[in-house]
């Protein structure tokens, strides 16, 4: 009864109701040939019949119908009875040889699995003279198994199909400067690759020449193409849409972002979700219990109430067929696989069914500031000439000095000013303060508040202006000559456009957002206000963030943590659910997290919670369906007139219902655009 867990990242993730692995490997790398599997229980992955599955099951159904018709229409003579029994035996052999082999192995190991139940039921029915029914039951059961596995394959193919998007060849630049098409697996890290419009990117890399729009829905789930230019990262399997790009390869085949997604999802699905573990423990007790109950139905009524033995045995065999917990066992893995796949198709990489189920319980989320709520890089947001200085001259001088500095704040100033670059003489960096130089023969400095104070150029009006900017979370750089301040340039890490809407979504789900940052408290409050967060905590070291997450767990209950840096890793690991921003995040943060948001969209946290809640609802719908149908037919079998036909249709119907219901989660989030 216990499904076989896959070993390692590359193995099967979950099992069907009879223990057959549902592999999430891409089609080219499948470990199992499903066309050669017996739907009736080839559970060791081998074909036990002379024909592939569909023709063999079709033949079994035809022969079983012939056996039924011979029983109903032909004379009840010994010759015709032997003919009918022979037809039934052929049908059982075609459909059920694999089931018998698996059932015998289970019995030899002391386990009462589903195949053992079906083997005993069919054999018993045949021996007590119900051979037409035994043949039809086995054929229908085999057909149900085949349909069930084909339906479950949809979840596997949805994620496995992503791997097929990566092209097999790449156009690589040779040492002589020519372009040559080579196998993608032969392209080394550091090589330059050309990607033409309409082609798929073969490997991860950084753009070195050109500009284009990239459809990266297959990796990040973004429905709108993203503009890429020199210095931007591109992912394998994404589609170059408009312009030719040259890129320097940063990851070889097998280690791209898409490879990591597939590997992580496979590893995640090899683990068991809480509901799935519960169902497996329940089934391990349920099956032998039902076997004992069926034995009691076969023996006790004839002894205690005088029932005919054949009638009691028949009811017991019907009970065994009804008892097969196919629907119950398969209800959880198919649902969890579908939920994980739906998330992965939107750029949400959930590392296991446990986290998929647990996300629904979140009551609070701690959010890092830089790179999570904000863009993660400084931008010039405001500037003004000071003390009557000329606007144009002030702007040009500041840009000229900023261009020659590698400091991020200087780069933001240079990028934010329309400028005519003027020559700078005697340029020098002032460590911890700013830079100085001569612009058009005039000695100038571009530096922080401390530098201006040291030069004695501060005034009450200037201090008031600086305070006003600092209260908004801005860093102010000042341009000054030897006598006066000439201009103020305010730089800030701006809030991402979607952050406020994402926070509102979390609140609507009943989740309290709290911002945790190492920046000063003033900046923290300004950013939190812009994002719509009431609780902002600044000046925190990594250990402080860890303590804050623990405090939030005590106060609110289940708490998530969202971050992208090394300093967030301890809190990510400690939280009930850790969310890492994958596009900008560090490898350490991504390893520590339970969920990776591949496109850094904060709104995907709310999507994860909604998907978790829907997955939980579908899981319990499936469990209720499976158990409810069993209970009804148990009553009919013991006290009513349920037949084996009714039993097998009930079992088959319940299995197909829970599979179809679980697969609905693939539509819970719109599928990504797959380029043709």
Where are these regions (language model features)?
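Flexible metal-binding regulatory segments at protein termini and peripheral loops
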Residues: 1-83, 152, 161, 176-184, ...
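Actuator/coupling domain of P-type ATPases
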Residues: 24-29, 64-68, 88-173, 179, ...
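Bilayer-spanning, highly hydrophobic alpha-helical transmembrane segments
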Residues: 59-62, 277-306, 318-325, 332-333, ...
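Membrane-embedded alpha-helical bundles of multi-pass transporters
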Residues: 69-80, 100-103, 108, 120, ...
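Small-residue-enriched core segments of transmembrane alpha-helices in multipass membrane transport
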Residues: 89-92, 142, 285-286, 313-331, ...
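Conserved catalytic phosphorylation-site environment of P-type ATPases
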Residues: 117-119, 154-159, 168, 219, ...
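P-type ATPase nucleotide-binding
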Residues: 380-511, 521, 530-549
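Conserved ATP-binding TGD loop and adjacent catalytic N/P-domain core of P-type ATPases
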Residues: 441, 475, 481-621, 629, ...
